[in-house]
Each structure stands twice: as structure tokens, then as C-alpha cells.
Regions:
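Bacterial N-terminal signal peptides
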Residues: 5-15
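Sec/Tat signal peptide C-region and signal peptidase I cleavage site
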Residues: 18-22
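Pocket-flanking alpha-helical
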Residues: 40, 57-99, 170-173, 189-197
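Alpha-to-beta junction loops
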Residues: 70-79, 134-135, 176-184, 200-201
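A structural signal for short loop-to-beta-strand junctions that line the ligand-binding cleft
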Residues: 97-111, 227-234
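Pocket-lining segment of extracytoplasmic ligand-binding domains
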Residues: 158-262
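Segments of small-molecule ligand-sensing domains
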Residues: 236-349
Length: 349
């Protein structure tokens, strides 16, 4: 279990930095040009308009973000891919290290889908053809690295070489003949694949439709013409970006109490300004479904506090009556049922 072990070992060896004297609000996102950091900046802007300061941090991606929420003080939020959450939850029951690694981490909000791209030489027709080949899987600790590793493991495919390099480096190597294929997880359309250097006679997006993967990932399709070299639709899978938080206990101490309030405040900002985020934020906000919760994970109690009808911030407009649409929540935890009721009351279902 390479990915789960990596997370567990990193947690066990982590050294906690000194805690700040006052609780700040922080979110871990991703690289400087990625979607995660833009989503984080949108949230921070909405928070600022409400008089709340939130610092947006670059990171290596999902793994660092999960570790940060779990282990790093004054780091209340981090964006993590849903397949990593699924993998951890699956193995936590039988692996004490993994169980400790995920303890206390909770969902804040589900976000948007990200498509798994696999660009390869034309003769590679499917995942099985990657056996023994040179395959780039992204920089270590990035979301692409984690997803590519999981996809290859689940499909039981063993490339001859797994290169941990950036997507730009991967494309250069592929075009030069030094690579057979590379993975890239990014929302469609991904700017990288707009390059006119990608010759349709030599390269293509490999369809990913393996049944075992479709049971774990969301089946999707990359429409024809999304990229200059792509003439037809391509079967694909998608992962969901999820905003994660920690299950702070306000009864424990002042730090937990203040951190819980920070989570409640930001949760209130996101839910009450969701329409504005969709209208003025990154285009991916338009694809966010706040009720599409990953299975097996609970909403943080501090999140639900911020979603309660009575929760108010000084920047809130006058209260208005909103009728909630009834939803079937009988199979969920009480925390998730409460979340759905309150989200439906705010944004509708």
C-alpha cells in the first residue's frame, strides 16, 4: 500500500512547528498556477469581505494538504482529492498506521470534478499497454502522483519505470521520445494539452474505462474537440476535489475553541456567498455540488455550527426566509444529515 504507507509514515515522523500565540486561519492548496490555489483565493476574498483574514498557502498537493490538516497547527483547511480519501478509508480498518493517519480529519465541503488525463504514444491503446513502459506520474506528493499511483495499482499494471517529474517536463520528454505516457489530473480543458506540438498522428489521450476503476472513480468523458489533437470523445474517470478540515473540540481548550470558530466562520462565508463564488470566482465553482459528499467521511461539527440558521456574522445581509427541499438522508451519519438539511436551506437542493 505505497500511498497509504507514505501518508502514515509521514504523519508518524512529523515534527510539529511552534503554535502561533493567536489562532490564524489558513488553507493549503496547490501549485502557483493550479486550480486549487485559485479556489483558495476565492474563499479568502469572500472571507476578507466579511472582515476575516485567511492566508492561502501553496503546497505540493493533496498529500501535503491532508497531512497539514491532520497535523499542522493553525491549518484549518486543505484541498484533497477524493480518491486519496477513498483509499485511506478502505485500508484504515485493517491497518493501525493508516487508521491513526486519518483520525480527526473531516469534510468541510465537496468541491468540483477533475478529469484524469493519460497522454501517450498512439500505439498505447489502454492502461494494460503501460506494462513495462516509461510512465511519468507527476511530482511526489502532488495530486497527479497520488492518483496515477492508485490507478496503476488498482489496474494491476506495472510500468518499467515510474518517473516523478512535472507535467511540463513530462510533455517535453514524451515529444522527444524519452517517455511513453504521462498522467495529469486537471479540470477540462487543461492548458497543457493546448500545445500545437502534440501531433494527432503520434499521440492521443488513452481511454480509461476499466471496470475496477469505474467502481472507485466517477465515469466521465472528455468531449471531442476539447484539445486540438483530439478528434473524438475519450472515455475517462474523474476525481472530486474536497475541502477538508479537522474535527476540533471546542470543549478541549482555547486553541480548539478558537480553531472551531474559524472553521464555522469560513463555512458560513462559503455557504452564504456560494452564488457569488459561482458568479465571480474560478469557473470550476459552477460545477460544485455542495451535497455530493464522498462516502465514508463525516462533515466536521464545526462546519455544521457555521451552517446553522442562527449563525450570523456582522457582514451578513438581513435574514430572509428560505424553504428547504426535503432530501433522503436516512443512510447517513447525523453530522452529514445535519449538513444536508442546512445546505439545502441555504443554497437549495
Amino acid at each position: 500500500l505505497p500511498v497509504a504507507r507514505l501518508i502514515a509514515i509521514a504523519l508518524l515522523l512529523a515534527i510539529l512547528p511552534a503554535r502561533s500565540p493567536a489562532v490564524e486561519i489558513n488553507i493549503l492548496t496547490g501549485g502557483p498556477t493550479g486550480t486549487y490555489i485559485q479556489i483558495g483565493r476565492d474563499i479568502a476574498k469572500a472571507a476578507e469581505e466579511c472582515g476575516l483574514g485567511m492566508t492561502v498557502h501553496e503546497s505540493a498537493g493533496s498529500l501535503e494538504n491532508f497531512l497539514g490538516v491532520r497535523q499542522r497547527p493553525v491549518t484549518q483547511f486543505g484541498i484533497v482529492q477524493s480518491d486519496v480519501l477513498e483509499y485511506l478509508k478502505t485500508f484504515a480498518a485493517n491497518d493501525p498506521e493508516v487508521s491513526r493517519a486519518i483520525f480527526g480529519v473531516r469534510i468541510a465541503f465537496p468541491l468540483y470534478d477533475e478529469e484524469v488525463h493519460l497522454l501517450a504514444r498512439k500505439e498505447i491503446g489502454g492502461l494494460a499497454d503501460l506494462e513495462g513502459k516509461r510512465v511519468a506520474i507527476g511530482v511526489e506528493n502532488s495530486g497527479t502522483f497520488l492518483t496515477a499511483s492508485l490507478v496503476l495499482d488498482l489496474a494491476q499494471v506495472s510500468p518499467g519505470e515510474r518517473l516523478m517529474i512535472t507535467q511540463d517536463e513530462s510533455l517535453t520528454a514524451l515529444l522527444a521520445g524519452d517517455l511513453d505516457a504521462f498522467f495529469y489530473v486537471a479540470g477540462v480543458p487543461a492548458k497543457l494539452f493546448a500545445s500545437e506540438e502534440i501531433d494527432a498522428d503520434s499521440f492521443h489521450l488513452v481511454p480509461i474505462g476499466d471496470e475496477v476503476l469505474r467502481q472507485v472513480y466517477k465515469p466521465t468523458e472528455i468531449p471531442a474537440g476539447t484539445y486540438p489533437f483530439q478528434t473524438g470523445p475519450v472515455e475517462a474517470i474523474a476525481v472530486k476535489a474536497v475541502l477538508m478540515t479537522y474535527g476540533y473540540d471546542p470543549r478541549r481548550n482555547a486553541y480548539h475553541r478558537e480553531s472551531c470558530k474559524a472553521v464555522s466562520d469560513i463555512s458560513h462565508v462559503i455557504s452564504s456567498r456560494f452564488q457569488t463564488l459561482q458568479e465571480t470566482g474560478h469557473p470550476k465553482w459552477k460545477q460544485v455540488n455542495l451535497t455530493e459528499l464522498p462516502a465514508g467521511w463525516d462533515i466536521g461539527e464545526c462546519v455544521n455550527v457555521g451552517l446553522a440558521p442562527a449563525y450570523r456574522l456582522p457582514c451578513d445581509p438581513p435574514e430572509a426566509e428560505t424553504a428547504a427541499t426535503p432530501v433522503d438522508t436516512t443512510s447517513e451519519s447525523e453530522a452529514n444529515r445535519a449538513y444536508r438539511r442546512q445546505i439545502c436551506a441555504v443554497v437549495g437542493c
